[in-house]
């Protein structure tokens, strides 16, 4: 179970919520920007079922620019060190945007490994409808090219990066798999109910129960090539589930990528066919117009 942030630690009952999840022997990832983590650590007890997933979008300058708040990187790093010193499990959650420099990203991954975290969960920024500053997000082709360049830097350096993701999802990011989204693999529940079909699309309605979500959602309406809202998405919430299914079906393929890394040269896997006839309102600007991050 993942509790998303922002900063969910502001919820006054969050320690009790986490305790209840752990009591059921469910793994919980508490996703936080870490602004309050150090002062709240005393409210939590280290457990193999609890992981703090800290939002870090790069090294100091890059992260502070991405979140538009100076000092957040240093605060997050301090919180990571404090949590690790107390025996908590910690990972980093990194979103990559347009204009990333592969060397800078590789430098961040190298640094993150020195913090004693279990791994980095990474995902390309996706232009979902209600996200601000739509021009900073990545299209699918640009995402794959970026990840190949990042992995090439790591391979050249012989870096030992640990990712909190399956090897075939990494292979997908590098452009070597033609995956369709599996949105039901990571369902979203909030105060409005069970969100259809995933946490990134917020205008598709809600279900009152998980059973209703699974049985009444028209899953075939969503995914790359099926819905223009989904066309540039490569987010882990939809594709990690697909990668896990592929891993179960083809364990040797997954093992090969785990041992030797993703292929970084040559043709990429073909994109899925486009079956929809147009562009939905609110979908992000075309990939050709995506530029570097700018801040007012």
Where are the language model's segments positioned?
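Hydrophobic pocket-lining residues within nucleotide cofactor-binding pockets
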Residues: 8, 37, 96, 125, ...
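Flexible mid-to-C-terminal extensions adjoining Fe-S/redox cofactors in radical SAM and related proteins
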Residues: 195-296
């Amino acid at each position: 179970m993942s509790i998303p942030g922002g900063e969910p630690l502001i919820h006054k009952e969050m320690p009790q919520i986490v305790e209840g999840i752990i009591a059921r022997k469910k793994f919980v990832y508490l996703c936080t920007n870490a602004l309050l983590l150090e002062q709240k650590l005393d409210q939590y007890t280290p457990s193999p079922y609890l992981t703090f997933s800290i939002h870090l979008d790069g090294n100091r300058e890059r992260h502070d620019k991405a979140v538009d708040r100076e000092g957040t990187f240093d605060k997050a790093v301090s919180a990571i060190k404090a949590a690790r010193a107390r025996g908590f499990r910690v990972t980093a959650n990194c979103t990559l945007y347009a204009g990333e420099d592969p060397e800078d990203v590789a430098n961040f991954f190298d640094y993150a490994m020195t913090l004693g975290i279990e791994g980095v969960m990474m995902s390309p920024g996706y232009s979902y409808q209600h996200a601000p500053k739509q021009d900073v997000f990545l299209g699918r082709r640009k995402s794959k090219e970026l990840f190949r360049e990042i992995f090439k830097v790591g391979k050249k350096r012989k870096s030992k990066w640990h990712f909190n993701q399956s090897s075939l999802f990494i292979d997908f990011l590098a452009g070597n798999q033609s995956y369709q989204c599996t949105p039901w693999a990571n369902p979203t529940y909030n105060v409005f109910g069970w969100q259809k079909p995933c946490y990134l699309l917020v205008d598709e309605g809600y279900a009152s129960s998980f059973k209703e979500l699974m049985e009444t959602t028209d899953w075939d309406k969503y995914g790359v090539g099926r819905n223009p809202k989904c066309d540039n998405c490569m987010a882990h919430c939809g594709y990690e589930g697909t990668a896990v299914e592929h891993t179960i079906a083809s364990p040797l393929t997954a093992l090969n990528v785990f041992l030797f890394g993703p292929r970084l040269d040559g043709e990429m896997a073909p994109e899925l066919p486009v079956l929809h006839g147009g562009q939905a309102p609110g979908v992000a600007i075309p990939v050709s117009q995506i530029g570097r991050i700018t801040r007012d």
